[in-house]
A protein has these predicted regions:
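Divalent cation-coordinating acidic motifs and surrounding scaffolds
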Residues: 1-180
Length: 181
């Protein structure tokens, strides 16, 4: 429990196989207004789990941001490569849909290091990863991989500050409390 009021938006269970996931965005109601939240329409069935798109407004500044919340398939190399190539199209489509709102942020568990050449097509848009730390927590309760990312174009998202990161004192307790794997 905190001194602040929180709320969330979430998706239905998403996934092609019997394994399904839900995406969610949790936010402080005194700071953020949700403008929209939906699951990306994937008519070509290019994603194992379609991204969640959340558009929000920071109440104090009036700035709008659009988040693409997405968990890349872990499957084969070719499956991952195909999904990562397609997320570029999603990013560009969202950015092109509203010329007044270019603050698009792609985030999530992307099952691939940001330095991989898989990301070259996204990087060609001027998008860069802003978190390149070990973030995934392994079974021995240590940091394991650089799969969790925040991608955006710094020329459009100039409010970004890299000065903060939450550190958790007991990774085992945290991991076991929020993850099923």
């Amino acid at each position: 429990q905190t001194a602040y009021n929180w709320s969330y938006v979430h998706t239905h269970a998403i996934g092609r196989s019997s394994y399904k996931e839900r995406y969610a965005a949790i936010y402080r109601t005194d700071r953020v207004q949700i403008l929209s939240s939906y699951v990306w329409s994937d008519s070509g069935d290019r994603f194992e789990r379609e991204p969640q798109i959340v558009k929000l407004r920071h109440k104090q500044t009036g700035e709008d941001y659009t988040f693409i919340n997405w968990h890349t398939i872990f499957g084969s190399t070719s499956q991952r490569r195909a999904e990562i190539a397609e997320i570029r199209n999603v990013y560009q489509s969202i950015q092109n849909s509203d010329s007044s709102d270019q603050d698009v942020i792609l985030l999530g568990d992307h099952n691939r290091d940001a330095n991989s050449n898989y990301w070259d097509s996204l990087k060609s848009l001027g998008v860069s990863n802003r978190v390149n730390d070990l973030t995934s927590i392994n079974s021995s309760c240590g940091y394991a991989s650089r799969y969790d990312h925040f991608w955006f174009q710094s020329n459009h998202t100039n409010e970004y500050s890299s000065s903060g990161r939450d550190y958790i004192s007991n990774l085992c307790t945290f991991r076991n409390g929020i993850s099923d794997h």
